[in-house]
A protein has these predicted regions:
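Active-site and NAD+-binding cores of ADP-ribose-processing enzymes
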Residues: 2-15, 20-88, 122-253
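Extended catalytic/binding region for NAD+/ADP-ribose chemistry, centered on the ART fold
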Residues: 89-122
Length: 253
């Protein structure tokens, strides 16, 4: 007996191929997912910051090394609202700019956080133009009284609820979000006079950022005259040595 023929069709009887799945979204650190071409989103500050922020102190008499534009005096706070740093410019709860000073526990830290901040983590020959260093001073400040600072070290950040990768180790595209944390700490922790963390650029030292409206007038004094980074021979030699340590050559005039 001949086998019965099945129904004929001009189309193939093969099942249609399922559509290719799209690549899964990669979650950003902290659990948020970044849309393509836009910065990822970090966690927002919790409402109970005053309870979870660990305090640390900067002792009276301990030097803060500051590298700053020559238009500012050694102890003069940056008034804001201009600039683009990790924790400044920021405003208080009334929307008024909070004056700030950045510094480090060593000269090398201050230089890495300013002069060499944008040197890439890449092997090979790297340069920085000498003109970018000009018109900057190195100042050494000491507080006349102990300062209370928010501790942003790894252990302390676990209690706050944000990893270092999201607050300290981010690139500039996330600075608008990291500044929200500085504003929140200022708003919720009335005793805190600034922030302190292990420097991203020099992890052998501490970086600090001070809230100018939380420090009494005259509490910062300089222990030595401010010196020009290029004009002062000893300071420029130290910069050249640090440049060599990180594989950078200072070029130009």
């Amino acid at each position: 007996m001949a086998k019965a023929k099945g129904p004929t069709s001009s189309k193939s009887n093969k099942p249609a191929s399922p559509p290719k799945p799209s690549a899964p979204a990669v979650p950003a650190a902290g659990g948020a997912t970044a849309a393509e071409g836009s910065p990822r989103t970090i966690a927002s500050p919790p409402s109970d910051l005053n309870k979870v922020v660990k305090r640390t102190s900067w002792a009276a008499g301990d030097v803060i090394h500051r590298i700053h534009p020559s238009k500012y005096a050694a102890d003069e706070f940056n008034p804001g609202p201009h600039g683009n740093s990790r924790f400044s410019p920021i405003c208080n709860a009334a929307g008024e700019p909070i004056p700030t000073i950045y510094g480090g526990s060593t000269f090398e830290c201050a230089a890495m956080e300013t002069v060499y901040h944008d040197v890439p983590f890449a092997a090979g020959f790297k340069t920085i133009a000498k003109r970018k260093i000009r018109h900057h001073h190195h100042s050494q400040l000491v507080p006349s009284a102990e300062m209370v600072l928010a501790n942003l070290s790894n252990k302390a950040l676990r209690k706050i609820g944000i990893p270092r990768a999201d607050l300290i180790d981010t690139e500039k595209d996330l600075y608008p979000q990291t500044r929200k944390w500085a504003e929140a700490i200022h708003a919720h922790c009335p005793d805190v006079q600034g922030l302190c963390w292990v420097s991203r650029q020099d992890d052998t030292a501490q970086a600090v950022m001070l809230f100018g409206d939380r420090l009494p007038s005259g509490c910062l004094t300089h222990t030595a005259p401010s010196v020009d980074l290029v004009v002062d021979d000893a300071t420029y030699s130290a910069l050249v040595q640090l440049a060599d340590d990180i594989g950078v050559k200072i070029t130009g005039k």
